[in-house]
Amino acid sequence: MLQSNEYFSGKVKSIGFTSSSTGRASVGVMVEGEYLFSTAEPEEMTVISGALNVLLPEATEWQVYQAGQVFNVPGHSEFHLQVAEPTSYLCRYL
């Protein structure tokens, strides 16, 4: 079953799914903007296209992740994203 999600007045859209190869996950697109996300459980984020400028919990410096790069976010935390161009991603819920 696919689940459509929309955040930040439609600036972030994703489709949630479950598969044997990725487990529970979502794939989505973000347009230009700054976003604050909260996690309920640990997440693994893979940038598919574009780039994300990320401030992870406990971090003091932003880090850019390009297409093909992966970062992890702890559960029960918040992380900040700056998006300069439309960017697609895969989020796996660990």
Swiss-Prot record:
User: Which enzyme type, at the first EC level?
Assistant: transferase
Q: Which SUPFAM superfamilies match?
A: RmlC-like cupins (SSF51182)
Lineage: superkingdom: Bacteria
Give the E.C. number(s): 2.4.2.1, 2.4.2.2
Q: Which reaction does it catalyse?
A: a purine D-ribonucleoside + phosphate = a purine nucleobase + alpha-D-ribose 1-phosphate; adenosine + phosphate = alpha-D-ribose 1-phosphate + adenine; cytidine + phosphate = cytosine + alpha-D-ribose 1-phosphate; guanosine + phosphate = alpha-D-ribose 1-phosphate + guanine
Q: Name one GO molecular function term.
A: guanosine phosphorylase activity
**Mind telling me which Pfam families this protein's record contains?**
Ppnp
CC annotations in GO: cytosol
What keyword terms does UniProt attach to this protein? Glycosyltransferase, Transferase
- Which HAMAP family does the UniProt entry name for this protein? Nucleos_phosphorylase_PpnP
Q: What does this protein do?
A: Catalyzes the phosphorolysis of diverse nucleosides, yielding D-ribose 1-phosphate and the respective free bases. Can use uridine, adenosine, guanosine, cytidine, thymidine, inosine and xanthosine as substrates. Also catalyzes the reverse reactions.
Member of which family?
Belongs to the nucleoside phosphorylase PpnP family.
Which protein, by its recorded name, is this?
A: Pyrimidine/purine nucleoside phosphorylase
* Native source species: Escherichia fergusonii (strain ATCC 35469 / DSM 13698 / CCUG 18766 / IAM 14443 / JCM 21226 / LMG 7866 / NBRC 102419 / NCTC 12128 / CDC 0568-73)
